[in-house]
Amino acid sequence: FSTLGSALAITNLTSVLESDGPFTVFAPTNDAFADFLTANGFASLEEVPVDVLASTLLNHVVGGVNNAADLTTRYINTSASFNAEPDAPLSMYVNTTEGVMLNGMSSVTTADVSADNGVIHIVDAVITLPTVVTFAAADAATFSELVGALTRADQPDYLSVLTTANGIEPAPFTVFAPTNQAFADLYAELGVAGIDDVDGGVLTATLNTHVIAGANVRAEDLVSGSVTTLGDALEIDATTAIITDPNGRTSQVIVTNVQAANGVIHAIDTVLLPQL
């Protein structure tokens, strides 16, 4: 773990992880860091912007002691945060279906290495700062239909847009993300077999209606009233967390504040439709 130690020293985070904690640290191997540097075009750790490196390291740290037996498939908060805002911790998607997979990109290879102030799990890849696409792709049990819609061949290049880094327009994003069940209900409502049977123009307008550009609106910051999306305007009742589309159809926010580095996702139980 010499590379991890060097990274902590460069970012002045060594003292943080030597404090009382307790912490759960997902620790990348030297090979994992080498792969990370190569994939991102860096010749050395020193070439990585210090703020990016610090955020990336904090994205591997979770408060409290989480032994392998305590980890379940769910979202947890890391010690990294959106735009360095302490009230907007970055999420991590833990999938324990087969072993322990983090954000769909890094697997625990050795678990439960005891430390004086917590526990360490060794991982085989650096957990890069997540985008809203990271979570949609990693959480296939919830969002695979949404990803299928976003990546349909006749659609705009949504994945490129939605991976735009914070600080570069049109990021950040607030995404109201329909679940797989929401899409199943939509297909029944429209009388179609699946996403491939939805008209291309309608699909584009529909997807656009689920995205607010230029704002990271967490659940606690939602206000009642009309909100402008990339598509049609929506009406939000912040008290009940119900969203009404232009057709009077309603959707309930069922999971809030899945926080990425370039925006936030709120899962909803009904697909919102543009004015039909």
Feature map (PLM): residue ranges:
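Mature, structured domains of secreted/extracytosolic soluble proteins
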Residues: 1-276
